[in-house]
Design a protein with these regions (language model features):
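Small cysteine-rich, disulfide-bonded extracellular modules of the LU/uPAR three-finger superfamily
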Residues: 1-84, 88-125
Length: 125
């Protein structure tokens, strides 16, 4: 993922100096139309379209990559989605990271957008 959010940067800074922040216990992937370091992902589709964030399990010793494909199912059109985000909750919660999809996904009818296994990478640099 291209960028950690300000929230995630603050978590890391507190962890590095031993302040023991409350770390996420799960990660959820989201799709959207943009993003910023301050707010994270922007333009998530409405739940009425069948959209829901997907749980993500990661593996790796340095760079963390999604173990399994992520499948976002939609019951109707959502247009073009260009970004992916990582959150600490299935709804609401805190944005942790965001970045652009390798290829924008356009969905003009019901269907599924799949993010392949090992294509979502989280790396602090």
């Amino acid at each position: 993922m291209a960028s950690l959010t300000d929230y995630a940067k603050n978590l890391l800074a507190r962890a590095l100096v031993g302040r023991q922040p409350s770390l996420p216990v799960a990660a959820w992937a989201a799709l959207g139309t943009g993003g910023t370091d301050a707010a994270g992902l922007a333009g998530e589709p409405a739940a009425a379209s069948g959209y829901a964030r997907q749980p993500v399990a990661f593996t790796g010793s340095g760079a963390q990559r999604n173990i399994a494909p992520l499948r976002f199912a939609f019951t109707g059109s959502v247009g073009t989605l260009t970004h992916v985000g990582l959150y600490d909750a299935v709804a609401g919660g805190n944005a942790l990271a965001w970045g652009t999809l390798g290829t924008p996904a356009t969905l003009n009818a019901a269907g599924t957008i799949t993010v392949p296994a090992e294509s979502l990478t989280v790396l602090a640099d």
